[in-house]
Design a protein with these regions (language model features):
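Pre-Walker A-like glycine/lysine-rich segment at the N-terminus of P-loop NTPase domains
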Residues: 1-45
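Nucleotide-state sensing region of NTPase/ATPase domains
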Residues: 47-129, 134-141
Length: 142
């Protein structure tokens, strides 16, 4: 799976951005509070999972914005595909022009693994937390 393009609108502090990653490894860098983690979170949502940073979808919508919209073009399963996420009080999703019953239907279409500072519990907590993290990460791999 390869991300070809990402269009973000009103997602947290990102009012509008279009990103076309280069082939291979891409490095995201910048000053604090400029949206690096927000960018990664917007990509993560296309895995069909919930945010790794908040419980309520509305928290992902930019200040004073009525909604957030993320669109991704990616190459997977031998062809170029697209997915759209619309976020207001909840998330709705489309894949290749078809509205999905739930964003969870994207699970297995796009793969990503996030390791965030909050995951330091992997070292500090017991085996139950480690197993849960590994189960989730392994579900993202083929």
């Amino acid at each position: 799976m390869i991300v070809k393009g990402l269009n973000i609108q009103n997602f947290r502090n990102i009012e509008k951005a279009y990103i076309e990653p280069a082939e291979g490894v891409n490095v995201i860098f910048g000053e604090n509070a400029q949206g690096k983690t927000n960018l990664l979170e917007s990509i993560w949502l296309f895995t069909g999972c919930k945010s790794f940073r908040c419980r309520r979808d509305r928290e992902m919508v930019g200040f004073d914005a009525p909604f957030a919209k993320n669109e991704m073009t990616f190459f997977a399963k031998g062809r170029e595909q697209n997915a759209h996420l619309f976020i207001d009080q909840k998330r709705t999703a489309m894949k290749n022009g078809v509205t999905l019953k739930s964003p969870a239907e994207l699970v297995g279409e796009f793969y990503a693994v996030v390791f965030a500072p909050s995951h330091l519990s992997l070292v500090k907590e017991g085996p139950l937390f480690r197993r849960r993290f590994l189960d989730t990460a392994l579900c993202e791999l083929k």
